[in-house]
C-alpha cells in the first residue's frame, strides 16, 4: 500500500470522505487520491515522493507556479509583523488600488476569504440594491456552495451526479432561476415570466466548472443588453477566470463591463482570498456606507494581502499574459493533434491560461446538455494513464485544467509525450 493510500484510509476516520473538498476524493475518476507533501514550480510531489507535472495548480491560484520565491518571501515578511489584526491596514488599500487598476470595472471592492464568500456577498448586494429577490444562473455553472447557488450547479456537484444539493430549502431554491449557458433566448424567457422580479444574472464568463466552455459569439453582449433593458445587474464570476484568461480577466478579453465582479484563486497568490466589487454607486450599498450587511473576521488578512499583492505585481510584468496563453495553446493544440493521430474523438477548448478537453464526437460543446453527452468513462481511463506517466490533471471530467508561468517547454513536451502514450493505449483498447 502506498503512503497516499494509507493516509487516505486514516483520514476517513476523522474527516468526512477523507478530504476537505469533495472533488479531491477522486470520486470523479475512481481510485485513491494522491496526498501531496510539497510542490515547486510546475511540479507537485506526493507523500511517496513521486513527482507529477501539475495542471490543477490548487484549482487555479498557482498561476506563477508553486512555491514562488517572491511570494514566499512576502508571506514571511508579513508574518513577522503579525498574523491578523481585525483592524484596517495600509496593505488593504494598496491591494484594492492594484485590483481596481487591473480590473477597472471594480471601482470599489471588498476583500473576503473565498470565492464562495465573494459570490454570496455579491448576490446579496444585487438583491439589496435592486430590491428584487430572484436571480438567474446557468445550468452547470458553479458559484460556490452558498445555498441559493447550489441549484443545477457544476463542479463537484456534477461529479456527484446531483447538481442540486440536499439541504437547500425549497424556499431558497425558488428564487434561483436557471438558464442554458450560451442561450440568450432561455434568459429572455425567464425575464418575460418574472417581470420586475430579477435582481441579477450571475455567470462564469468562461464556464470552468463543467470543464471549459467559452461563450459563443454575442452571448455576453446579449446578457449586458438584457440586464440594461430589465434593470438587473450583470455579475461576472471571475473567481476562476480573473487574471488568468487575461490580466484584466475575461471581461477584458471579451470587452464587456459587468456591474459587479467576483474574484478568488489567483488574487491570493495561494492564500485564501476572495473579493467582490463593481460600480461605485452599487458598492456604496454595502455596510457601513449602506444597508446591505457583509462582514468577516479575517477579511483583508495582512498575510493574504501580501501574497496577493506580490502575485499580481509579478503577473502584470510585460509579456507574462501572452506567454501564459501561448504555453496553454501549445499544450491544447498538442492534445488535439495527438488525439487525431490516434483516432480518438477529442474536442479541446483553451482561453488564456485555462483549457479543457472532452472525449466526444460532437462538433461543439456549448452547454451542460452537451457536456453530459461526453464520454466520462474514457476520461477516467485517460486520467489514470496520465497519472501513471507523471501528469496530474483535474480528477474530474467536469473541471478545467490550468497552466502556470512555471510550465516550460520541458514540462509541456513531457506532458505531450505522456498524452501520446496514453492515447495509443486508449486506441488499442478500443480495437480489442
Swiss-Prot record:
GO annotations of cellular component type: cytoplasm
InterPro entries membership: 4pyrrol_synth_GluAld_NH2Trfase (IPR004639), Aminotrans_3 (IPR005814), Aminotrans_3_PPA_site (IPR049704), PyrdxlP-dep_Trfase (IPR015424), PyrdxlP-dep_Trfase_major (IPR015421), PyrdxlP-dep_Trfase_small (IPR015422)
Catalytic activity: (S)-4-amino-5-oxopentanoate = 5-aminolevulinate
Cofactor(s) named in the record: pyridoxal 5'-phosphate
Origin: domain of life: Bacteria
Gene3D superfamilies xrefs: Aspartate Aminotransferase, domain 1 (3.90.1150.10), Type I PLP-dependent aspartate aminotransferase-like (Major domain) (3.40.640.10)
Modified residues (N6-(pyridoxal phosphate)lysine): 265
Keywords associated with the record: Cytoplasm, Isomerase, Porphyrin biosynthesis, Pyridoxal phosphate
Protein name (record): Glutamate-1-semialdehyde 2,1-aminomutase
PANTHER family linked to this entry: GLUTAMATE-1-SEMIALDEHYDE 2,1-AMINOMUTASE (PTHR43713), GLUTAMATE-1-SEMIALDEHYDE 2,1-AMINOMUTASE 1, CHLOROPLASTIC-RELATED (PTHR43713:SF3)
Family label: Belongs to the class-III pyridoxal-phosphate-dependent aminotransferase family. HemL subfamily.
Pathway assignment: Porphyrin-containing compound metabolism; protoporphyrin-IX biosynthesis; 5-aminolevulinate from L-glutamyl-tRNA(Glu): step 2/2
Secretion signal, residue range per the UniProt entry: none
Amino acid at each position: 500500500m502506498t503512503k497516499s493510500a494509507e493516509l487516505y484510509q486514516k483520514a476517513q476516520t476523522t474527516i468526512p470522505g477523507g478530504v476537505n473538498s469533495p472533488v479531491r476524493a477522486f470520486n470523479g475518476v475512481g481510485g485513491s487520491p494522491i496526498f501531496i507533501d510539497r510542490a515547486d514550480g510546475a511540479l507537485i510531489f506526493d507523500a511517496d515522493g513521486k513527482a507529477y507535472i501539475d495542471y490543477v495548480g490548487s484549482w487555479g491560484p498557482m498561476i506563477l507556479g508553486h512555491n514562488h520565491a517572491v511570494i514566499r518571501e512576502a508571506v514571511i515578511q508579513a508574518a513577522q509583523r503579525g498574523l491578523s489584526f481585525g483592524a484596517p491596514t495600509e496593505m488593504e488599500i494598496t491591494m484594492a488600488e492594484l485590483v481596481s487598476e487591473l480590473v477597472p470595472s471594480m471601482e470599489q471592492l471588498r476583500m473576503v476569504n473565498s470565492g464562495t464568500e465573494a459570490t454570496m456577498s455579491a448576490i446579496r448586494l444585487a438583491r439589496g440594491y435592486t430590491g428584487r429577490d430572484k436571480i438567474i444562473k446557468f445550468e452547470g455553472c458553479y458559484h460556490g456552495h452558498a445555498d441559493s447557488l447550489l441549484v443545477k450547479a457544476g463542479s463537484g456537484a456534477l461529479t456527484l451526479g446531483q447538481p442540486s444539493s440536499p439541504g437547500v430549502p425549497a424556499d431558497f431554491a425558488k428564487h434561483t432561476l436557471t438558464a442554458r449557458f450560451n442561450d440568450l433566448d432561455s434568459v429572455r424567457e425567464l425575464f418575460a415570466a418574472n417581470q420586475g422580479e430579477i435582481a441579477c444574472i450571475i455567470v462564469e464568463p468562461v464556464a470552468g466548472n463543467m470543464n471549459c466552455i467559452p461563450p459563443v459569439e454575442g452571448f455576453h453582449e446579449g446578457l449586458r443588453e438584457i440586464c440594461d433593458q430589465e434593470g438587473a445587474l450583470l455579475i461576472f464570476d471571475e473567481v476562476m477566470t480573473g487574471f488568468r484568461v487575461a490580466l484584466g480577466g475575461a471581461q477584458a478579453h471579451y470587452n464587456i463591463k459587468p456591474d459587479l465582479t467576483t474574484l478568488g484563486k489567483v488574487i491570493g497568490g495561494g492564500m485564501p482570498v476572495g473579493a467582490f466589487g463593481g460600480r461605485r454607486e452599487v458598492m456604496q450599498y454595502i455596510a457601513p456606507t449602506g444597508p446591505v450587511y457583509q462582514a468577516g473576521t479575517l477579511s483583508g488578512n495582512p498575510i493574504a494581502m501580501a501574497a496577493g499583492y506580490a502575485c499580481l505585481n509579478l503577473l502584470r510584468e510585460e509579456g507574462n499574459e501572452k506567454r501564459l496563453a501561448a504555453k496553454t495553446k501549445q499544450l491544447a493544440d498538442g492534445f488535439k493533434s495527438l488525439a487525431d493521430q490516434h483516432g480518438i474523438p477529442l474536442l479541446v477548448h483553451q482561453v488564456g491560461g485555462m483549457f479543457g478537453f472532452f472525449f466526444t464526437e460532437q462538433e461543439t460543446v456549448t452547454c451542460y446538455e452537451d457536456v453530459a453527452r461526453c464520454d466520462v468513462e474514457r476520461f477516467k481511463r485517460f486520467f489514470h494513464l496520465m497519472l501513471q506517466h507523471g501528469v496530474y490533471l483535474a480528477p474530474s471530467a467536469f473541471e478545467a485544467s490550468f497552466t502556470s508561468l512555471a510550465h516550460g517547454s520541458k514540462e509541456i513536451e513531457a506532458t505531450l509525450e505522456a498524452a501520446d502514450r496514453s492515447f495509443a493505449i486508449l486506441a488499442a483498447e478500443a480495437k480489442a
